[in-house]
A protein has these predicted regions:
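Central helical "cap/lid" subdomain
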Residues: 199, 203-252, 382
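Dinucleotide-binding Rossmann-like beta1-alpha1 core, especially the glycine-rich loop
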Residues: 59-137, 260-265, 269-271, 406-424, ...
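Active-site lid/adjacent beta-loop-alpha segment flanking the redox-cofactor pocket in flavoenzymes
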Residues: 226-227, 242-350
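Glycine/proline-enriched, intrinsically flexible loops and inter-domain linkers
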Residues: 389-471
Length: 471
């Protein structure tokens, strides 16, 4: 059955799945549900597709991660984006460039060796290179202070809006429907146990609801009395004026990352685009993003990012004489551990979460595929436990989320040494003998909000973790 018109088509009153949110992740899920044979599915978006974080994204798609689950997501996304334009007829702007991740310390190279071994077991094409080999891949950089680099061969970038549109088009071609400019105002349960999604244009009754609300996912979750631990964090990226060296360059230019500054850098047209990750980061709209916010930049804070731009210029000297074409600042949703929230929501039947992703373009292909498997087949084909939203219980407060989300952004490029314990927002829950253990030199870790003693420092030994990839 259908009711009022929405986005040029009649709004269905009944569907099997309603996806809330038209960013790249929501559109990817819709696309992959149809690939598994579920075509009675709809997506509801309050504004235009890609009007949230997707609209502001740089479009980088990389396979680097220390997390095996995320590596599978990234790997699949690249495969999908390479093929999507030919399948749907919608341009995605995909470019295979490869990427370099620089190392200026031996600890960083140890990290790369650790990740390299994991990547090779997954069939990811990557290798370690010397400073001289790295310079051949990115000829505009100085190699002073470099120990080496890691090279991922198939990394690249895409047009976020074009890729999202391609996913939406592919889903529509298979029978799904997309309703833009139609905000969800509430959720309720029918006597049958089905969900009723109350939208501005009418109600849709469905079996399953997926919250892919992006920056608004916490507000959607609140409609079913669920607190979703995520916080928008400001992120700048800067485009330089056109550069003659780039204009005359033949072929693609390998993208560049220096995690010890940190920044990412890639070719954009005849120029270079850089995104720094500042330690003095700032949360935005901590009490919830306004429903009418869409496709808008946040105020630029040049003072906050200038030190990173100056360090970039030391690495790529030709940028010292380059002007700035534009600076953009936009919000990215971060969770307490920097990992997204993917899967069923505890205590709310047939309600799934697809939110809190700070690498949305990189991971969207994979999360759409594997969440679709979870919904249709009852379980995903890979282990997604590290992303399961049920890892955060009712102990996760707003103040904890604030502190830990900011920490997650600051430590985005932190050395991924196993057993590293983060400290923000702690302690949350302590056992009765916590004070006694602390007095005895306990060094604590945290699991599911609980403080637990990992080890005890002997007399004369400072009770501090000193972690390394080496013994």
């Amino acid at each position: 059955m259908c009711t009022a018109s929405c986005d040029g088509v009649a709004l269905k009153t009944q569907a099997r799945v309603v996806v809330i949110g038209g960013g790249i992740s929501g559109c990817s899920l819709l696309y992959h549900l149809t690939k598994l044979g579920w075509t009675d599915v709809v997506l509801v978006e309050k504004d235009e597709l890609t009007s949230g974080s997707t609209w502001l994204a740089a479009g980088n798609v990389v396979q680097w991660t220390s997390n095996r689950c995320n590596a599978r997501l990234h790997q699949y996304s690249i495969k999908l984006y390479q093929e999507l334009e030919a399948e749907t007829g919608q341009a995605t702007g995909w470019r295979t460039t490869g990427s370099l991740r620089l190392a200026t310390t031996t600890d960083r190279m140890d990290e790369y060796r650790h990740v390299l071994s994991k990547d090779h077991t997954l069939g990811i094409e990557c290798n370690l290179v010397s400073p001289e080999e790295a310079q051949k891949l990115f000829p505009f950089m100085h190699t002073e202070g470099l120990v080496g680099a890691m090279h991922h061969v198939l990394d690249g970038h895409c047009d976020p809006a074009g890729t999202t549109s391609a996913l939406a088009r592919g889903a529509r071609q298979a029978g799904a429907e997309v309703y833009r400019f139609n905000r969800v105002r509430g959720l309720s349960r029918a006597r049958s146990g089905e969900w009723v999604v109350h939208t501005e244009k009418g109600d849709i009754t469905c079996e399953i609801v997926v919250n892919a609300g992006g920056l608004w996912a916490d507000r959607v979750a609140a409609m079913v009395d669920v607190y979703l631990p995520m916080m928008p964090i400001e992120h700048h990226h800067v485009l330089f004026e056109d550069l003659s060296e780039i204009e005359t360059l033949e072929g693609e230019l390998t993208s560049l990352r220096d995690p010890d500054v940190p920044f990412y850098l890639r070719k954009e047209g005849n120029s270079l685009l850089v995104g720094p990750y500042e330690s003095d980061c700032k949360a935005w709209s901590a009490n919830g993003v306004a429903w009418d916010w869409a496709q808008m930049d946040l105020p630029v804070d040049l003072e906050r990012i200038q030190q990173y731009i100056l360090r970039l210029m030391d690495r790529v000297p030709m940028l010292k004489d380059a002007g700035l074409k534009h600076i953009r600042n936009g919000p990215i949703a971060y969770t307490p551990d920097g990992q997204q929230l993917l899967g069923p929501v505890y205590g709310v039947p047939n309600f799934y979460c697809l939110a809190g992703c700070n690498f949305g373009i990189t991971q969207a292909g994979g999360v759409g595929k594997y969440l679709a498997e979870w919904i249709v087949e009852g379980e995903p084909s890979i282990d997604l436990s590290s992303l399961d939203p049920r890892r955060f219980g009712n102990w996760t407060s707003k103040s904890y989320t604030w502190a830990t989300a900011l920490e997650a952004y600051r430590l985005q490029y932190q050395l991924a040494i196993p057993d590293t314990e983060r400290v923000a927002g702690r302690p949350v829950k302590t056992p009765p003998i916590y004070d006694l253990q602390e007095a005895q030199g306990a060094v604590f870790g945290s699991r599911y909000g609980w403080e637990r003693a990992n080890w005890f420092a002997p007399d004369g030994v400072e009770p501090v973790d000193r972690l390394s990839f080496r013994r």
